[in-house]
A protein has these predicted regions:
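Short, well-structured secondary-structure segments
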Residues: 8, 13, 31-34, 51-62, ...
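Conserved catalytic core of two-metal-ion nucleotidyltransferases
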Residues: 24-49, 95-203, 208, 216-240
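Active-site nucleotide-donor binding segment shared across nucleotidyl transfer reactions
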Residues: 43-76, 85
Length: 241
């Protein structure tokens, strides 16, 4: 495993991304509940239609380090293979029936609650795909990124974002191909989710966030609180225990 942070361009050395995190407004409890409910519905969708998926980016970090949603995070990030996107769109009524919004996007698919914003409508191209960075819904938002097999890193075959913009924004977010196709189960808040096998997950998170991802935040500060935010129902159960 490469621990040479001097040559890394991981997110914890990217000033623009660190400033973005620092400016995030933590979700309130109502929003947290909606985030978990949308996540739960998405997992059920993938399981119903036999789609391999992973939680990625900050959601993978939150699962491995905090056990769920990082307190400042306001969405969940999923990843699926590019070959499965048409299956998602073909069966989008699953989400619509549950009052969720679904839109095609440059990165893959955007899901959420509330109404689509005017700015998101203006960002659509001729194929009705939202282009560029965007939180398109007035409620909570969720990304489903598309991945594909793409080259080697440290002689390890990896999966990368299909979106060129995503590759430029998160160049070190590469997932070991072996782990991608052989997921295990982990806990995210109160939900059971697909996760990479531990050695693949550690490698992925170190590439993405550097060797101190388990103990430090993006500003280089040692973390004192490793808790996650929970759905209110789960918080009540925890208090009773």
């Amino acid at each position: 495993m490469n621990t040479d942070i001097q040559i890394s361009t991981n997110q914890y050395k990217n000033k623009e991304l660190i400033e973005l995190w620092s400016s995030k407004i933590p979700p309130n409890q109502h929003e947290i509940d909606k985030i978990y409910e949308l996540m739960n519905g998405t997992i059920k969708f993938f399981e119903t239609f036999g789609i391999n998926y992973h939680i990625v980016a900050g959601s993978a970090l939150g699962q491995a380090r905090n056990g769920g949603l990082i307190p400042y995070d306001d969405d969940v990030d999923f990843g699926i293979h590019k070959n499965d996107v048409e299956k998602v769109l073909k069966n989008k009524q699953f989400f619509i029936n549950r009052n969720y919004k679904i839109e095609k996007a440059e990165i893959g698919i955007k899901l959420g609650t509330g109404d689509i914003t005017n700015s998101a409508i203006k960002q659509k191209d001729s194929s009705n795909t939202i282009m560029g960075p965007c939180k398109p819904f007035t409620g909570v938002n969720q990304d489903i990124f598309l991945f594909e097999e793409d080259g080697l890193v440290d002689n390890i075959p990896v999966m990368r974002y299909c979106s060129k913009r995503a590759q430029l924004t998160w160049p070190d977010e590469v997932i070991p191909r072996k782990g991608w196709f052989n997921p295990e189960k982990g806990i995210f808040g109160n939900l059971k989710v697909n996760v990479l096998p531990k050695n693949n997950l550690d490698w992925y998170l170190e590439k993405s966030y550097g060797p101190l991802w388990k103990t430090h935040n993006g500003q280089g500060d040692k973390l004192e609180n490793f808790e996650c935010t929970l759905h209110s129902r789960n918080k009540l159960l925890t208090k009773k225990d």
